[in-house]
Amino acid sequence: MTFIEQSRMITNRWVAAILVGMVITIESSYAIKPNRVYSYTPDKLKLTYEEITVNTDDGTSLNVWHLPSEEEGRPIIISQSDAGNMGDWLYLGLYLQAYGLDVWMYDYRGFGHSNDFAIVQDQLFHTEFVTDLDAVAEYVYQKTGKAPALMGLSMGTIIVNEFLRRTNIPIGKVIFDGYVANPKEWIRRLAANGKTVTFPDGYRNRKYRQKEVESLFIVSEKDTYSIISDIPRGKQGKHIKTFDCEHISGFFRFPEEYTTGIVSFIEESF
């Protein structure tokens, strides 16, 4: 049995339980709600992996799971949403690994088994999370010698965009699911639904202007926060894939189509 066949067999065993758990997590988003306890771990799913500690420039230790590909696959770094921890997205990592990508997952400070951090729940994000991605991306680039692809989920799209503004690390491609094009507009939409969210102290809101990085935007058609009209117009190298589902739930509703769409996008033209 090949590596991919083994991985697919494992995913089929766990799919029902993970779908139920993740739908609950997704519904509780729109506030920073980290969880220190992993519901799913690579050991529990019997995955090939290594657990790594990556240190940031400001002295924080981050927990990282590396799910290596069977061959020299393209590295992808997943920046998660604002709730739970990377264990909630391990099923996604498993699928991407099974399809040949070199997967890197990490917890922001205050999430999972990364260092403690004073979380302000009703804040859109913490700028320190961008520092976390700085450290992980630098580690992955130095370790693999390849320009990593980046994937951001909901709040993670903010982290990726803020990172792109300041990094000198070469980036392969970018995948956004639950895209936050304009943080100020995102806060307005949340307020219209009774949720008060603030910016980090000293944060200067600017509508994102994409660097020349080829990007895939995954859009959930029933999402009332991240909508297709938010996607930058006229951007070269822009790809859009839609799913009939709610906010950042495309993978859990359509795992095969979601995964193959990402893998095809990353591997195309490399």
Segments from the language model and where they lie:
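Short beta-strand/loop motif that positions the catalytic acidic residue
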Residues: 211, 217-219
